[in-house]
């Protein structure tokens, strides 16, 4: 379940497993500043206990500064981890207590884009201990994505059309554009937020 800053404001209970993939300015038409936005997003783990798990992306300059009340499990494409999911030489590894095991090649992830490698690593960290490595690999290699996120719409006259309308911030739009290796024509609209 993905929760927006609006849904998290005033949250009284935290899930046993929570994750924050990254934090970039968003919904600043509603929040007075980025700090207030971060406070709203971090409410997801504010009431966790020692037994709970928080998953953070260590490569994000904001999320790497956050602190867990319970067990911290991280992801990184830039460094090997003792506890978490990391990428090394295009292979995704899971590490627990300093012992690592190979999960899968990043190239086997069905959904395109570097940001989806992060998303898959986060998902693997979230379900670690609840799902087998085989199940994680099966999902990563078969899951085609969700509506409105680089969703293939159709091909007409050799042109492929994709819907990425959920990309409602510059960082999300850039991540989506970087998923394509071929020339892209972007049709965009909306308003500042």
Ranges and model annotations:
Residues 13-16, 50-51, 68-70, 81, ...:
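Short coil/turn connectors at secondary-structure junctions
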